[in-house]
Amino acid sequence: MFLKSELLECNGSSVTLFQLSALQRIEHLEYLKQLEAVEVGDFQAAITFTVKSGAYLVAMSLWHGHPLKGSQGENAAAEVAKIQDEVMQTWPTELVAEAEYKVKLLSGMIAPVIDEPTSSGEERNEPAEPVTAGKALASELKFAMKLAREFGRPDWRAMLAGMSSTEYGDWKIFYQDNYFHDAQLDAHFSGLLYTISTLFFADPELTPDSFSILSPAPEAIDIDDPDDDTLMAKAAGISGGVRYGPDGSR
C-alpha cells in the first residue's frame, strides 16, 4: 500500500513522516479511549496521557521507515512502543506537536487550514497599538492557564474562544503575519499547553485545585498563593521566554 510521506526538519536534521494506514488510525482511536479511564481531577495523569498520545501517533508514522520495523517479528505494537519511548525521551515537545499535526494532515485526520482571500473592498481591523510577541504570549498564557486550572486536558480552541475580540485580534495578527504559518498554529498551541501543564505538576505544592478560578475551595485560598503574573512569568521561563519573529524583533 502506498503511503504519503513528508520530511520533518529540525536543527539541520530530518526524519520522514508517513501517512497512517487505516488500521493504524483505528489503533490510534483505541489508544485514545484510555483517556476515559483517567480519573476526573487527576490532572497529572491526564496531561501525561496527552503527551504520550502525541508521541504514540508520531511513532506509528515513523515506524514505516524506522530501523526497528520488523525487528520484533509480528509484534509491530512492541516496535511502535519502543519508537514512542525514543520520541518522548529525545524530542522537544514542540517538535512532537508539530510532527503530530503533520501526521494528522497526511492521514486525513484533520483538514488543512485555508486562508480566505480578502476582497479588495474589505477593510482589515488593525490593533490600536503594535502587537508584540510579549503581548501575544501574555494572552496565550492567561487563557491556557485558565483552561489548565479548570480542565485536566486543555483545548486551545476553547482557549481562543475565551479571548476577548481585542485579545484574539492581537494574537491572530502577530502569529499569522509575523511568525507562524497557519499550518503551524495547531502545533504551536499543543506545545504551549504542554508548557502550561508542566507548570502545574513541576511543583508538588502547585495544583489546579489550589488555583481554581471558577470554584476555589475555601481551604485552598491563601494570600500567599502566586497571582497570574507570577504564574505567567514561570510559564514563560519554562517555554524559553518571549518568542521572536523572523526578523529578530520582539
UniProtKB/Swiss-Prot annotation:
Which gene is transcribed and translated to give this protein?
gene 15
State the protein's purpose: Promotes tail assembly by creating a scaffold for the tail tube proteins. Tail assembly proteins G and GT probably wrap the linear tape measure protein to create a tail assembly scaffold. This allows the polymerization of the tail tube protein, during which G and GT are released, therefore they are absent in the mature virion. The tail assembly protein GT is produced by a rare -1 ribosomal frameshift. The ratio of translated G/GT is about 20, and this ratio is important for proper tail assembly.
Q: Tell me which Gene Ontology terms the entry assigns under biological process.
A: viral tail assembly; viral translational frameshifting
Question: Could you give one GO CC term from the UniProt record?
Answer: host cell cytoplasm
Instruction: Report the family membership.
Output: Belongs to the lambda-like tail assembly protein family.
Subunit structure comment from the entry: Interacts (via C-terminus) with tail tube protein. Interacts (via N-terminus) with the tail assembly protein G and the tape measure protein.
Record keywords, A-Z: Host cytoplasm, Late protein, Viral release from host cell, Viral tail assembly
Q: What is this protein called?
A: Tail assembly protein GT
List localization entries.
Host cytoplasm
Q: Name one Pfam family in it.
A: Phage_TAC_2
Major place of residence: host cell
Superkingdom to which the source organism belongs: Viruses
